[in-house]
Amino acid sequence: MGQNASATKTQATYKQTLPKSRIKELFQTRALQTLSARELASIASKLNIASFNDSHVVTLTDLAYLLQLSNDKEKNVSSIHEDFACVVRILYDSLTILGNLPFLGDSLEADDNSQLTLKSLIVASAVHTGRINSFWNDAEYLKLLFISLSFPPTKQSSEKAAEKWEQVNEDSAELSFRTVPDEKDSSAQIALKIKWADFEHLTTYDDLDVECLRVPADNMVKLITLLLLVRSVRLQSHDKMQFLLQERIEKCWNKFEGAALSLVRFMNVDVNASNMNSKCITYEQFNSGVVNGFLNLFTDVFRRLFENGFLGSIVADPKAPQPLNENIEATATEKESKAAADKKQERIKKAYNFEETRLVNDASLALIATALQASGINEEISRETVVELYNGAHAGFSIRSLESKIFKWQAPTIFLISGKRLRSKTIAQNKRYQQFEDMFPRFFRSTENPRKAWQTDSDKITYAVYVEEPWRNSNKSNFGNELTTIVNLSPRYDIYTSKHDPVIKGMSVYFNNLGMGIGFGNDQPINKNNVRRIIPGKVSLTVEANLEFAVFRHIFNSSANTSAFFNFSRQEAARNEDYEDRFMITDLEVWGIGSTKELEEQKKQWEWEEKQAQARQSVNVGTLSEDRALLEMAGLIGNHGSGGSV
């Protein structure tokens, strides 16, 4: 059945050997079949193309425009921001490698000038949107992503991977079919008959050993910086989204990069700002870090870039920073809805009067939102939903002042505290600290060095605590529930969720205005008969009553009598360790989480624009014959199917 093909038939299935080039063509066709006529029309319109042939090359500028990372397809990415240009290149190379599916090993032979074709981009989009699971249901997304990011591999890993790959590299491969293909079948029909989930080059990831591969740490930092930037922009008017994203890329990159570095340190705690150009991330570190700490950051943002960007109906307009006021063929009801939306825009704009503080900005909010989502907390955290309740830099560092600012807020809050790590000299000579230490029991002996390799004198330490219940005086009993979560924001990222306990019931917080301070994860302090003693739990954050010192404690090897309100670290390197962060407080802030009304209005605006764009596209691609023409253009039906030869 065609040249260069051999076939065998068994009772269970029909098998045939085909050239790799033909298999890759059929795989691309199968990926194309996951797209709708509307999505095909959108891609064709954005690229101004008349056919979906594999010779069409996507440039770096094209890619940024297609993913809605740039609103101007004529603007060179390097003119936006130097690091942004680097990460677009990282994405470009990653998508090029995914586009080589099912033959990932071909990437080992690729040179530095490999080009991303349109069909390869469509294959990569099937991976990132999850549509590939419709014909390869065992695809491991994180493994595919890691492989794509690890090229070009380091010299050592490249040699190991290439040596193994050369042993299995052939010009043809065997495919299994559900039914015997007919000589008259088109490529589209053949692609549907193939049992892709059984194809060995897919099930073995082309025999690549991911344990030999590495991702440069600085590349990972740049990629996560971009993901956090995209995540920080909530769904709203598309033009407003473009404006905000461009503004944050140009003005806030360094802040988001700092947040990204914390996340990368969750993968590999040995990475820091000074050595990330020489450090690498292994697959084990990547998989563990993403799964335990921020899975949704990758899956949600990449899906958004492809579903709403590459495959979406909206075309960015660099000359229209504000939402368009006109629509095509709008009904009277739609016009009324648009008029109402325009009026709401004035109220929505008020949300952007948000003012940054030392601890809260778009980057830190994106990091907190990532942690809470990873903890299973369904809370919208963005500049549109948070309200500053207390800021020690403005209101003064007084527990009475703090009490007066936060006790009336009857909704969830985020308690943020930051400071400089205490040095040995301060611990030995500061009398106020020594008074606090008299109440706070030591765990480490005076002869021990309690520092871990990842802890340094220069660290800026920042923690955030999500508290769902309203604050109150709790001089006799703790309050809180099992949603209370401690998040380490810097110098590394970590999450400490509340333990499920039918007795404790998550009551892990106390606010004591009688000289015992604030505690998360502690038993009630003792304060009677001239005895003043804090009783820290296995995982706890304790704030001294004068708001001058704080201690985060994580004691894995504590006694059985020590209370456990929070789970241990989610980071592999720290989970079974005993460590503390003792620091002098420089900033303390409490932010209330407010109504999501503005977010809902913004999302409605986004949905309205999507609907209008699809309506306009329906006008342009409205007839059955035109739908068919699009599918023929993509080679999915008609005379473009290369029938007659499998």
Curated annotation (Swiss-Prot):
Q: Which GO terms describe its cellular component?
A: cytoplasm
Tell me where in this chain the TLDc domain is found: 358-594
SMART domains from the UniProt entry:
TLDc (SM00584)
The alphabetical list of record keywords is: Cytoplasm
Which parts of the chain span the membrane according to its record?
A: none
Give the Pfam families listed for this entry. TLD (PF07534)
Location of this chain's protein in the cell: Cytoplasm
Chief subcellular location equals cytoplasm
Job description of the protein: May be involved in a process influencing telomere capping.
Q: Which family does it belong to?
A: Belongs to the RTC5 family.
The name on file for this protein is Restriction of telomere capping protein 5
Q: Which organism is it from?
A: Clavispora lusitaniae (strain ATCC 42720) (Yeast)
